[in-house]
Amino acid sequence: MNRARAVLGSACGIHFVHDGFSDILYVLLPVWAREFGLSFAEVGLLRTVYSGGMAAFQIPAGLLAERVGEARLLAAGTAATALGFVAAGFSGSFLALLGCLIAGGLGSGVQHPLSSSLVSEAYETGRRRVALGTYNFSGDLGKVVVPAAVALAVPWVGWRRAVETYAAFGLAVAVVILLVLYRLRAGVEVAPRIETSRSSMDWGIRDARGFQALAAIQVIDNSTRSGFLTFLPFLLIAKGSTVQAIGIALMLVFAGGAVGKFLCGALAERLGVIRTVIITEVATGGAILVLLALPLVPALVILPVLGVALNGTSSVLYGTVADLVTSDRRARGYGIFYTLGVGASALAPFVYGLVSDWGGVPLALGLVGSIVFLTLPLTLLIRRRLAEAAA
């Protein structure tokens, strides 16, 4: 195995673990709501503080990596996330859970910008978009496997033991990844600080309007995804679902999402970025609205198709970021891009939780599905710049 593939494999392993941590929350939220007597707003706040912690640390992580290297930060962040979930397994109140999830989210904030930077550097002269697509797919594998495994384990060993077991696995991965990256000399060397005419606050963005356009679609896309996934389990419970069935439902969504990232990436090569984004966003909004009216079994049947559209847009957007940012500021650029997206993911569950408390989960999800269509005029507005970025 050559160095580039080894770096990609390491980044994929980290992505698998962190997305597993992030998305077991969708299984645990209904369990916590029942055990701690939570309102929908409180449920949304749990998701919000985790994603908010991720968002808060992504730009600092990109800056700090320039001083200490990606490898150390990735290992430390993975360990911090795992320890946050270990602590969650011992929590006995809503406030304790909030604290644990904030800590876990902060640790997970290093993963996206630094792993993406490592992969981009390893494939600087190679098939970077394909490598980043593979990296994104590994996260979807974590989304498919880990929530399903935890959902199956909860009725047998309880949610605390299930969470602690996966957290122990995360700690082991943190150690292994650090050793592997050091062996590969990836993210270890810290470039000497050479002051030039460039300001230290220069983010290296080549095309500000193009970057803003990508980020705006990312914000809407991510808020749709997190809002939908947070309250999908409650919609399914209202239709008669069990905890185990929720795990299967999430697995279906994430499996569709994994396919969607590959399928939509290929579709973008054939149809272009603009047309692909329009197709995926229209399909996402339409499928969410249809889902509300279906009984449980038909709802489960359409979830993989919904997953394809729900995750498909991201594969089109991520590969373009590196084209809009200079190579020496790439960790910063990814940090900004992911911060905006994760920030939207953080805010959406709490907002839709308030809507759910006021008017019910179906109303909140109807709003989620409708807001997706706001991407259409935005996409048409930036047609020329996105087309140039994708060229």
List each language-model region with its residue ranges.
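Cytoplasmic helix-loop-helix junction between adjacent transmembrane helices
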Residues: 100-139
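Interfacial helix-cap and linker-helix signal at transmembrane-aqueous boundaries
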Residues: 32-33, 64-65, 152-157, 236-237, ...
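Structural signature of the two symmetry-related core transmembrane helices
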Residues: 72-86, 275-289
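Extracytoplasmic gate region of multi-pass secondary transporters
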Residues: 25-26, 210-258
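Helix-breaking motifs and short loop linkers at transmembrane-helix boundaries and internal kinks
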Residues: 37, 69, 90-95, 272, ...
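Residue-level signature of mid-helix packing/kink "hotspots" within the transmembrane helices
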Residues: 23, 51-59, 144, 254-262, ...
